[in-house]
Amino acid sequence: MLDPQGLYAWEPKGLAVVDMALAQESAGLVMLYHFDGYIDAGETGDQIVDRILDSQPHQVVARFDHDRLVDYRARRPLLTFKRDRWTEYEEPTIDVRLVQDTTGAPFLLLSGPEPDVEWERFAAAVQQIVERLGVRLSVNFHGIPMGVPHTRPVGLTPHGNRTDLVPGHRSPFDEAQVPGSAESLVEYRLMEAGFDVLGVAAHVPHYIARSPYPDAALTVLEAITAATGLVLPGIAHSLRTDAHRTQTEIDRQIQEGDEELTTLVSGLENQYDAVAGAESRGNMLAEPVDIPSADEIGLEFERFLAEREGDN
């Protein structure tokens, strides 16, 4: 493997600001990370990243070489043409940024398109950055398509070696093989190297998984802020407002839709309530319910990923 440091470059001004922040944050910084392009049902992670960058002060600390990592023919960046010339190019960027929450507390955000190649080298580069920037906890987040109804609270699956930071959420999975991602490999390699990592996956109703689902993003954001101590009330308020609007629109579409969709949602509600009831009784008197098998979970992930890649 080539030297991972060849994949990124430091921004001197941003790095100097991080060093100043580290002098005041003896425990280290939190780093959030999410990449666009893999399974992110309900655009859960994308919504959080977009709102952070739109609403919070930030500056670039390190920039990855996207020419090495992004396959432009697979995900063609947009250029704007006006009259007789190209006027704008939406350059893909994979950056580490220093961000301030509402109280001014610093944290890091690594985001951009998911690398298409050199995953191992990329994961090693992220580890170098984590070491250099004194990261105490790395947190990734996304949505996964699940057989759950939109009329019930959004479930979470915490993963990594710091799931204790998101108590009260038991994983519905025993063991499952799903298509890999750079985000997951980074988590795996960081844990392997002894770093603290937390992943938060929201359960998004599979029938709306390809549309923005603010409820999922809000639930994930609340879990992240509770686990890290970050203060982001403006983003939470924005997501809560959008979530109310989205739920109203989903209910309207279901009421105006065919009977098959109504039956589907009703069946998912019954299944959800049966599982919740079984858990509250310790599974001692639970009636049998249909829980997705590992193979079914893997197929659902593959189907969603194939549909997403087909749109690109």
Put a short name on every predicted segment.
Residues 62, 108-110, 139, 196-201:
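Hydrophobic/aromatic beta-strand patches that form the interior of the parallel beta-sheet core
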Residues 46-53, 127, 184-187, 191, ...:
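Predominant activation on well-ordered alpha-helical scaffold segments within soluble catalytic domains
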Residues 105, 113-165, 186:
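Internal, conserved structured core segments that host functional sites
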Residues 62-68, 137-143, 236-238:
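A generic structural motif
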Residues 147-230:
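Catalytic cores of processing enzymes, dominated by hydrolases/peptidases
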Residues 208-312:
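A conserved C-terminal secondary-structure "cap"
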Residues 2-112:
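N-terminal short beta-loop-beta anion/metal-coordinating cradle
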Residues 43-47, 117, 121, 181, ...:
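Conserved active-site and cofactor/substrate-binding residues in soluble primary-metabolism enzymes
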